[in-house]
Amino acid sequence: MPKAPAKKAEPAPAPAPAPEPAPAPAAPAVDLSAVKVEFSADQIEDYREAFGLFDRVGDNKVAYNQIADIMRALGQNPTNKEVSKLLGNPSADDMTNKRVEFEAFLPMLQTIINSPNKAGFEDYVEGLRVFDKEGNGTVMGAELRIVLSTLGEKMTEAEIDALMAGQEDENGVVNYEAFVKHIMSV
């Protein structure tokens, strides 16, 4: 009798797909009610004046998306991520449409001023020194433009042009210590 062909073994069933990883939790919002505002009356008046310059509606409030600009106008340099965290990680729509009054702005400003993560002159110079191939205190302007447009908080071409205006010599080279002094004074 001819042998019946051996039955092929069924392939093992595919394993169940791994569960989707949980999305990373958004950075928790800062409890601004716990922030002690430590500004002098003169400072508060200066801050109120700067805040008022950004009030385009006349209701003594500014849009969420103006908070970082006001802080920068007051000499601080918060990242967009830091400001977003202060605002409770709002949506893009909220950034445009929600508004903040001056009294709510003060604890935000105090938080940024008290932040231990501030980079100083030497930190920025050290970061740019990596691109100083000659060891002579300069970097190529074109390379600096690429860095500004691709790393960290990416800048637009218009922002880079404004920042770099007058910084490159006739050979397209930038003295990075002078550049850092320039950007820290803007």
Swiss-Prot record:
Family annotation (SUPFAM superfamilies): EF-hand
Record's compositionally biased regions (Pro residues): 12-26
Keywords on this record? Motor protein, Muscle protein, Myosin, Repeat
Task: Give residue ranges for domain EF-hand.
Answer: 42-77, 119-154
Q: Which cysteines are joined by disulfide bonds?
A: none
- GO molecular function annotation: calcium ion binding
UniProt modified residues of type Blocked amino end (Met) = 1
What assembly does the database describe for this protein?
Answer: Myosin is a hexamer of 2 heavy chains and 4 light chains.
Q: What more does the record tell us?
A: In fish, myosin MLC1 and MLC3 appear to be produced by two different genes unlike in birds and mammals, where they are produced from a single gene by alternative splicing.
What name is this protein filed under? Myosin light chain 1, skeletal muscle isoform
* Organism of this sequence: Chelon ramada
